[in-house]
Structure formats: structure tokens, C-alpha cells
């Protein structure tokens, strides 16, 4: 028992001395991990007699509970301290007087800038902008786009669903801007040539994914558009956006419910010293998905696939910004850090065009 008391004193002392969450995690692993000191004691219970096991087991479990309680309490203290330090570091006094003339001007967020670039480039190719609501019906987000009832995208782990209404119908936060294409085809007759930029939502969060992100999709519907036209549009867009005289694209067969055939598009690039350059090199980078609009989607939108055809594509706006302007972590886009915006933001009077994109 004396050994357990000594171990308890040592562990509680280490927990109290942990200066940050990584140090605290090291103490937890050293005590409660698979090879930790308390875990070793618990594994040795099987070698004891029933009476010893009863006495020692109760004491070891009490030690384990005490350590878990101390870990939880210390973790809360460290999280509070980290939050206070961050708030103190980012505090802005909004009561300060207006900055004098000549002070640094505000900057345009990279997402806003890239959306402006997309609008300008595609406008030069005759596209208009179509928009729709962020909260969509299941019908527009899935059914009219030819998603089968058992498609994984309809699961809770991938889509944000609202509670059902009194009729049992559930609305969703749109998972793509494709519902805008549906609304466009229902509202107007071909020829159609639109891009659909906007916010989209999925249950995902890591260095390259966030629960809310931005996407732009394009749609062309008429009587004769084909994959050759799609290839030309994508090449011209990527050349203008990445400001290169040439791009080489690789089309790979893929599957999307709303297009047939469906393709993933890779762009040729080189990677050197952390920099990606397009139009050269031996590497390939996946950049977007596309395909010919599925006949079922046309029928669902009141268009005869025997008369009309067309193509569509989709690409992540946040990903475009990261690739063009060298931003490593998508999560920083939405942390409202003025210092980050000052570094990556843009001046208000810069304008892109089809002939030239816009680099800082």
C-alpha cells in the first residue's frame, strides 16, 4: 500500500507540474497507457490470490480514479489558460480613435478575392452567375440530381440535416451548389451557361476540410455542347486563373450520380521547395470533377434529353485559393485573425481578367 501512496503522490505531482496539454498527455500515457505504471499494476492482479486481488484491486482502482480526476481538472485549467492567452493576444480595443491618414488599409479576404476572379474570368467566356439558398430540400439537393435513396451522401455522417417537419420532410444544409443548377434549369429554357458559386456544408474537419466551405459549379445546356467544349472551357479557365500560358489536363473515369460519363480532372504540375507550378513538370494534381449532365437530371428538370444535352463541373474555391496563393491550412481561412488577413489579403482595387488572373 505504501508503494501505491508513493506512486499516487508522484503522479499527482507530475500532473500539477504539467505546463501544457502535451505534457499532461505524456503523464496520462505514462500512467494509464498500455504500458503505463497503473496499467502494469492492473495486469498483475491475475497472478494474486482472490483475497489479495480484492484488496489490491480496490486500492489500484482508487488510484486510477484519483489520477483520472486530477488529469481532468488539470486539463480544464490548461484549456482555460490557453484560451485566456489567445484572447489576450488577439484583443482589439474597439474604443480607440480612428487611425490617422496613411495607416494600413483593410484587406479583401482570399475567398472573396478568388470568387471575384472566377466571376471575371467566366464572365469573359459568356457565363452569368446563378445563386440559391444555403438551406435546401432533399429533393433539390439529392433526388432531382439522381442520387439513389441509399447513397452514402444521404447519411447523417456526411450531411447536416434539420429536424423533420410535421410531414416528416427534412431540409439540409446544401452539400454542393448543384441545387442551384436544378433551380436554373427549372426556371429558364436552354441555352443555359451559368456558374454557381457559394457556401456548402459537410460533416468534415481537418487541415484541408472544414464543415463549411466554398464551391463553384458550372453548367452549360444546349442542343450540341460536348466534352470537347468542356475541355476547352476548363483549359482556358485554369490558364487564366493560374496565370500560365499552357496547362495539360488528364481526364480519369469516375462516378457522380448527376453526370454520365463522369470524370476527375488532374492538372500537370511540378513541385519544388514547397511551391507548385502548373504547365510543367512530371506530377499530376487532382483539381476538379466534371461530366455530361445525366439524362435523368435533365428529365427531372423538365428537359428532354433527346433534344438537350450539356456538361457540368465543380471545384472547391478554398482549394483554388490554397493552391494559387500558398496557404497551407484551410482552417485559418475562418479564424478571423487580422494578422493572417493582413498577410494573405488583397488590396481593394486589384482586378483580374481572362487575359490575366491576379497574384499578390
UniProtKB/Swiss-Prot annotation:
Protein name: Phenylalanine--tRNA ligase alpha subunit
Entry keyword set: Aminoacyl-tRNA synthetase, ATP-binding, Cytoplasm, Ligase, Magnesium, Metal-binding, Nucleotide-binding, Protein biosynthesis
Localization terms from the record: Cytoplasm
PROSITE patterns: AA_TRNA_LIGASE_II
Stretches that traverse the bilayer: none
Assigned protein family: Belongs to the class-II aminoacyl-tRNA synthetase family. Phe-tRNA synthetase alpha subunit type 1 subfamily.
Cofactor stoichiometry and binding remark: Binds 2 magnesium ions per tetramer.
This protein's encoding gene: pheS
Lineage: Bacteria, Pseudomonadati, Pseudomonadota, Alphaproteobacteria, Hyphomicrobiales
InterPro entries: aa-tRNA-synth_II, aa-tRNA-synth_II/BPL/LPL, Phe-tRNA-synth_IIc_asu, Phe-tRNA_ligase_II_N, Phe_tRNA_ligase_alpha1_bac, Phenylalanyl-tRNA_Synthase, tRNA-bd_arm
Primary location class: cytoplasm
One BP annotation, GO: phenylalanyl-tRNA aminoacylation
EC number(s) on file: 6.1.1.20
Cofactors required: Mg(2+)
Coiled coil regions, renumbered to chain: none
Quaternary structure, from the entry: Tetramer of two alpha and two beta subunits.
A GO molecular function held by the record: magnesium ion binding
